[in-house]
Amino acid sequence: MNQENTQIVAAFYKFVSLPDFAEKQEPLLAYCLAQNIKGTILLAKEGINGTIAGSRLSIDNVLSYLRSDLRLQDLEHKESTADTPPFERMKVRLKKEIVTLGLPEVDPNEQVGAYVTPEEWNELISDPEVIVIDTRNDYEVHIGTFQGAQNPQTNSFRDFPEYVRQNLDPNQHKKVAMFCTGGIRCEKASSFMLSQGFAEVYHLKGGILKYLEQIPPEESLWQGECFVFDERIAVVHGLEPGTHELCFCCGHPLAEEDKASLQYEEGISCPHCFDSLTEDKRMRQQEKWRQYQLKNSHSLGNSKLGVAD
């Protein structure tokens, strides 16, 4: 990796009351643009959620700018690197929620489960009395998860409450441990679980990314790669880039075996979308792929890239 061109990728979030969040949008965007930062930051009444990339100095400046607000002075972030810019532009968006559960009454600023550090995580999820739940979407779980974790098979985080109502019982499932990419979804999920009467609710502090950063492979209970919402697509231990790519048609992460399938055609289809392609859709996709190649873009422009939502 060329150290001079190395991009620092910083991911952060914090649940904190920000009643003036809309007023922060334009100044924050202007500051990020002045620092040549790219990525996405979400602002809502319940807090902030973002992933940004840029030079070492620019990232440090933006994080200092954010922490100059006393409500964000203890804002934690996770870092990784990329050898090319992982985002095309800078966006600061106003949202109802910084991660969309669809239940405004669930407020992590009021109550959350117990934080578990990466060093404590293995012991917790090895307890046979603990049910371990991956709160991410099915396409993320598909490429990697923790040993023994339950996959709710959700298409979006909004589906998680229904999964809980249909499959979990506070009287039967006494201890619940949850995890997600960076910690934000499992933190909000823990608040929801407590509101549903679950007594012992735990969540992985810093998420999978912090675990992969701190826990050596020989001690790890993680299996596979971790999907990330930028053009690296996936990372492994040490937060090094993984091997997955995105299907240009449906956006599903693809492993090498997916690309070896007879149902895979670059830019057109993969095993996850092949059966849903009518002849008309295939023709439109072929034209879309042709136009993409003509533009010689360096970005997939896929809707899955940005921040976890």
From Swiss-Prot:
It holds the Pfam family Rhodanese. GO terms for biological process: tRNA modification. The active site is at C180 (cysteine persulfide intermediate). Residues 126-220 form the Rhodanese domain. One of its GO terms (molecular function) is oxidoreductase activity, acting on paired donors, with incorporation or reduction of molecular oxygen. Keywords: Oxidoreductase, tRNA processing. It catalyses: uridine(34) in tRNA + AH2 + O2 = 5-hydroxyuridine(34) in tRNA + A + H2O. Its EC number is 1.14.-.-. Signal peptide: none annotated. Catalyzes oxygen-dependent 5-hydroxyuridine (ho5U) modification at position 34 in tRNAs. Belongs to the TrhO family. PANTHER family: RHODANESE-LIKE DOMAIN-CONTAINING PROTEIN 7-RELATED, THIOSULFATE SULFURTRANSFERASE/RHODANESE-LIKE DOMAIN-CONTAINING PROTEIN 2. This is tRNA uridine(34) hydroxylase. It comes from Nostoc sp. (strain PCC 7120 / SAG 25.82 / UTEX 2576). The gene is trhO.
